[in-house]
């Protein structure tokens, strides 16, 4: 990019708007090229052609959005460090408490909060992210996390022991499955009962805590992929889209065909 900027600085007038526009479209504004993007944006903004100048404004806007995102995510990492001098802080979250079918899944994640130059951008409450972004982030989180673990209870366990017990149980099992023992566990929503370790709960933790947000994303992707596989076996329930929740299509299929082996019978009393 340095050579491109140098050439543009000397010969920008020889670049047509289309060429400049195509170059800007191909640019990936990221943490490694912020200085170069700013230099290019300033250069384009100074061009007398309004359409070229507008491309500079667009680049500048993209750069500012990246900087804001960095600050947002850094604050999530700072939040995890705000509880005290803990070396390893784990976040734990669940997905699948409310569906009529499928498991409840929990994930626990420990991040490297000591290196703020390598934070994972765009992490958030998994429900606020697109499916594509969740899938992408899930792989990045698994690669960059110091440790992560996933636990689940299936529909039979939920019917036998209750959703409250299973929710707490998968929290514990996910934390116990980490290959690094956490000094502190941050749990989304409420404290973990009968947990043998330091634990603090965070209301709406998946929007405040970096490690809880990462756990939310991993758990969501893992469970969604399970439900996509069940969709192949039971296509009439539309599990690929509703992932087990009680949509009209799902409820209509239940009334017409009846439940499957993955349905939570204790959740269907008011439906069947």
Swiss-Prot record:
Catalyses which reaction(s): Endonucleolytic cleavage to 5'-phosphomonoester
Keywords carried by this UniProt record: Cytoplasm, Endonuclease, Hydrolase, Manganese, Metal-binding, Nuclease
GO terms (BP aspect): DNA replication, removal of RNA primer; mismatch repair
Subcellular location(s) per record: Cytoplasm
Binding annotation for a divalent metal cation: 93-94, 188
Cofactors demanded by this protein: Mn(2+); Mg(2+)
Cofactor remark: Manganese or magnesium. Binds 1 divalent metal ion per monomer in the absence of substrate. May bind a second metal ion after substrate binding.
Keyword Nucleotide-binding listed: no
Main location: cytoplasm
Classification via NCBIfam families: PRK00015.1-1, PRK00015.1-3
Family (UniProt): Belongs to the RNase HII family.
Its biological purpose: Endonuclease that specifically degrades the RNA of RNA-DNA hybrids.
Protein name: Ribonuclease HII
Lineage start: Bacteria, Bacillati, Bacillota, Clostridia, Eubacteriales
Gene that specifies this protein: rnhB
């Amino acid at each position: 990019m340095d050579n491109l900027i140098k050439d543009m600085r000397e010969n920008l007038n020889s670049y047509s708007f289309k060429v400049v526009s195509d170059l800007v479209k191909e640019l990936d504004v990221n943490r490694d090229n912020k200085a170069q993007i700013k230099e290019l944006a300033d250069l384009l903004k100074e061009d007398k052609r309004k359409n070229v100048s507008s491309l500079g404004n667009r680049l500048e806007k993209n750069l500012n959005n990246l900087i804001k995102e960095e600050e947002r995510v850094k604050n999530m990492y700072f939040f995890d460090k705000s509880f005290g001098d803990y070396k390893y802080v784990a976040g734990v979250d669940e997905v699948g408490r409310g569906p009529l079918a499928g498991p409840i899944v929990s994930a626990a994640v420990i991040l490297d909060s000591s290196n703020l130059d390598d934070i994972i951008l765009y992490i958030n409450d998994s429900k606020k992210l697109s499916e594509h972004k969740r899938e992408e982030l899930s792989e990045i989180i698994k690669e960059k996390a110091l440790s992560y673990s996933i636990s689940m209870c299936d529909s039979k366990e939920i019917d036998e022991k209750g959703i409250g017990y299973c929710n707490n149980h998968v929290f514990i099992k996910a934390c116990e499955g980490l290959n690094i023992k956490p000094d502190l566990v941050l749990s989304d929503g409420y404290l973990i009962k009968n947990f043998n370790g330091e634990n603090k709960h965070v209301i709406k933790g998946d929007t405040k805590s970096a490690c809880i947000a990462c756990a939310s994303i991993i758990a969501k992707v893992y469970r969604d992929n399970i439900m996509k596989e069940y969709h192949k076996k039971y296509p009439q329930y539309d599990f690929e889209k509703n992932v087990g929740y009680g949509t009209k299509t799902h409820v209509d299929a239940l009334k017409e065909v009846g439940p499957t082996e993955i349905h939570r019978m204790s959740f269907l009393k008011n439906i069947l």
